[in-house]
UniProtKB/Swiss-Prot annotation:
Binding site for Zn(2+): H121, H125, H131
Protein name (database record): Endoribonuclease YbeY
Keyword annotations: Cytoplasm, Endonuclease, Hydrolase, Metal-binding, Nuclease, Ribosome biogenesis, rRNA processing, Zinc
Record family assignment: Belongs to the endoribonuclease YbeY family.
């Protein structure tokens, strides 16, 4: 993909999510977000879970006892292992299908567009982007908007997007 390194993606289904995008789209969105961030070499696991699993993870790792849409866990090399002892692992992204579905309905967004946004958002967190302060949020949101726009999806932060039920111009991915 234009000489920019992209990750290997492993999809894990830990939830029955009949309206979730297929693995082809999920993998493409992960890779596209990585490209938007400048590229990355390594393995990314994308795990689709239910509310119980994401609530447990959110409670255990963020002290928030509630389900959330997406969590990212960058890989940290265990102490004592020599450099290069393991294949390059980028980390894990956990997405709750039920929360994504609920948010898309509440925000009046097409489900596929919200899935693409959550995947992109998770990848950027995995690669070190954040939105804790305003300056960082601007950087991260700009990358999200650009990456999603390149895939044919509307700006997820636009008030017009949140009021529109229109499908994105392109729900298929560009090669």
């Amino acid at each position: 993909m234009n000489g920019i390194p992209t990750p290997t993606v492993d999809i894990q289904w830990a939830s029955d999510a009949p309206d979730a995008p297929d693995e082809t789209h999920l993998c493409e969105w992960v890779r596209h977000a990585a490209i938007a961030a400048g590229g990355v070499v390594g393995d990314i696991t994308l795990r689709i879970v239910d509310e119980e699993e994401i609530r447990t993870l959110n409670r255990d790792y963020r002290d928030k006892d509630a389900p959330t849409n997406v969590l990212s866990f960058p890989f940290e090399m265990p102490e004592g292992l020599p450099e290069g002892a393991m294949d390059p692992l980028v980390g894990d992204i956990i997405i709750c299908a039920a929360v994504v579905r609920r948010e898309a309905n509440e925000q009046h967004k097409p489900l596929v567009a919200h899935w693409a946004h959550m995947v992109t958002h998770g990848v950027l967190h995995l690669l070190g982007y954040d939105h804790i302060d305003d300056d960082d949020a601007i950087v991260m949101e700009t990358l999200e908007i650009r990456a999603l726009g390149e895939l044919g999806f509307p700006d997820p932060y636009s008030p017009a997007q949140q009021e529109s039920q229109a499908q994105p111009e392109n729900t298929e991915l560009n090669p």
